[in-house]
Amino acid sequence: MSSSRMPALFLGHGSPMNVLEDNVYTRAWRQLGETLPRPKAIVVVSAHWFTRGTGVTAMEAPKTIHDFGGFPQALYDTHYPAPGSPELAQRLVDLLAPVPVALDKEAWGFDHGSWGVLIKMYPDADIPMVQLSIDSTKPAAWHMEMGRKLASLRDEGIMLIASGNVVHNLRTVRWHGENTPYPWATAFNDYVKDNLTWQGPAERHPLVNYLDHDGGSLSNPTPGHFLPLLYVLGAWDGQEVITIPVDGIEMGSLSMLSVQVG
């Protein structure tokens, strides 16, 4: 990575409780914020904004969205008042054309997939941010292509952060007691790591075709938490180093794998 090029990050965000906790994952996020070059702005792709069509937050002051239930009041009292950037939102509209991108000026904001990790990386909430939605109607290869289109922003001092979980099966989560990962969850998590640097046509990429893996559908009964990874891999130039800042599987079937490009 050149000295001026921003990295691209995929962060396994896990439970909202990570906002309140100090653990190996939150410490890794904090270290990223302390050691990586400070971005001029951030584009976030979160698993929690899954839409028909593509949208981008375009307000001056996006709200903090508490898109979860049954957690301690302290979580609902926590806000992340990072400024928005209507200018950057318009830049994405132009950059992603001919894909139509709707400018969202009031409906959304920063959900816990975005602010839940950024509050650890940049606790002062002073870096302008926009959040890009994930179009639920498009195939996996399309999302990787979106990452390729976003890659040029990295040379403008803008960091791309995608947030999800490459293993995300809440039906099999061990909510209490036993925390040992299921063998299929470990196998799929390893499969992801083994294929991060695969090169070739997007439609043939093993991670675009993740459902072909024996544990793919069990690890991801729905695609929303897996697809953010493809934006970051799409922004890879094929030569940059790809590293893993932190890894682990919590509650049996929730991968906390994070991936850094550059």
Give the ranges of each region predicted by the language model.
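Solvent-exposed alpha-helices and their adjacent loops that cap or buttress functional pockets
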Residues: S2-S3, T35-L36, M121-A125, S152
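Surface-exposed, charge/polar-rich loops and edge strands
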Residues: D94, P98, I127-P128, S136-K138, ...
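Short, basic/glycine-rich phosphate-binding loops at helix/coil junctions
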Residues: L9-F10, D67-P72, Y122-V130, L207-V208
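Short glycine-enriched loops at secondary-structure junctions
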Residues: A47-T51, P62, G109-L118, V166
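A short aromatic-anchored loop/beta-hairpin motif
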Residues: S2-L103
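Beta-strand elements within well-structured catalytic alpha/beta cores of enzymes
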Residues: P7-L11, A41-S46, L132, L153-V166, ...
